[in-house]
Amino acid sequence: MSLNNTFVHHVHFWLKNKEDKSRLIRGLETLIPITHIRDIHIGVPADTDRDVIDRSYDLSLLLLFDSPEAQAGYQDDPIHVAFAEGYAKPLCAKVVVQDSVNI
């Protein structure tokens, strides 16, 4: 199955304090109602062990959008802004974002 016309937004989060994991999960769950998002996956590193796998992050967020414009709308959505300010910035030591589009 090919994900045609898809903008992929993949975010990895490294917590300052591991004890804040459930709090960050609650924050990520606040993003679910954002209408610009087509699909959402909140996850943790899989139990896989290969040299090319980075399992150092604490949580990941994978979002699928129908277009770059939908992703831009997500960035400006007040729910996303509140998540970034209230959860990601205070709780995370590092955040890495990888965006991709179809070839």
Located regions from the model:
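Long, highly charged amphipathic alpha-helices
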Residues: 23-26, 82-86
